[in-house]
Amino acid sequence: MTFKVAAAPISWGVSEVPGWGRILEPERVLSEMAGLGVHATELGPPGYLPDPPTIIGRNGLELVGGFLAVPMHDASAAEGSVAEASATAKKIAAGGGEIVVLAAATGLDGYDGRPQLDDAQWATLIDTCRRITEVVTAEGLRVAMHPHVGTHVETEAEIERFLADSPMPLCLDTGHLLVGGTDPVALAERHPTRIGHLHLKDVRADLAAEVRAGRVGFADAVARGLFVPLGDGDVDTEAMVRSVHAAGYHGWYVLEQDTALGPDSDDCGPRRNTARSLVHLDEVFSRIREGR
């Protein structure tokens, strides 16, 4: 029984959000992943790995896929979003990856503001997803929608509406789902056939509630420690892994801990936190393998 584990640059503070924090060099991030025994990674934000096959292969890693947040609800921007998805898919395919992880961006910087969509904008979003699916699958890749804080597919109601209106599978991100007010395990059990990809995160429920209530912005919450190593927060990682495994999921378990590095942050922190998460995840996998 094999569980495929990958990491992602966001655990080292590498984000597409302007002003997010200090960005560590790719060689350091990838070499630390490899040093922890992780053999696969997602791409990171656009431009972070300009030549994925070379730099990832040099560190003994394989490419899983990449995250892409683009506006899909605005008819005037849809063409550009489809083109960006096509370019991203080509880069991932060239690097040997298999999936584009899509998020329905608002068009604003960051994830702190989220205008509501009317029915026409929602219909455009769904149609843009269809068009993006076409260009991504043309490259031999899969695509999955990532419900994400501060996007147009965030809340439980929006996720259910999306599943009803689009055949696209989901990337279940345990942290973003919980922050957005969705029980990730319950969602996986309701829709076992729609699980396309998995991001394993853990979060503090107290800070998640503050974000949900609008009292704390997402970026501020991240800086205050919203995301923690697996097993240290309020997500039931083991229940999630057991649920998707029972549903027949054989894809990647991508370990993530959204992190922002300030001027005085300890650059060794991401490696230590990822190591702790890996220990917890390995214990979960061991119990499942042993039938416990």
Predicted regions: what is each one?
Residues 40-52, 71-82, 149-154, 176-182, ...:
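Acidic-and-aromatic substrate-binding clefts and catalytic sites of carbohydrate-active enzymes
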Residues 7, 33, 41, 56, ...:
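Conserved, mostly hydrophobic/aromatic
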Residues 265-290:
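C-terminal helical cap(s) of enzyme catalytic domains, especially alpha/beta-barrels
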Residues 58, 77-171, 179, 272:
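Active-site acidic/histidine proton-transfer and metal-coordination neighborhood
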Residues 2-9, 40, 62-67, 98-101, ...:
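Structural preference for beta-strand elements that scaffold enzyme active sites
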Residues 11-25, 71-81, 114-121, 229-231:
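Active-site mouth loops of central-metabolism enzymes
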Residues 7, 127-234, 285-288, 292:
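Acidic/histidine-rich catalytic cores of soluble enzymes
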Residues 1-2, 30-35, 48-65, 83-97, ...:
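Acidic (Asp/Glu)-rich catalytic clusters
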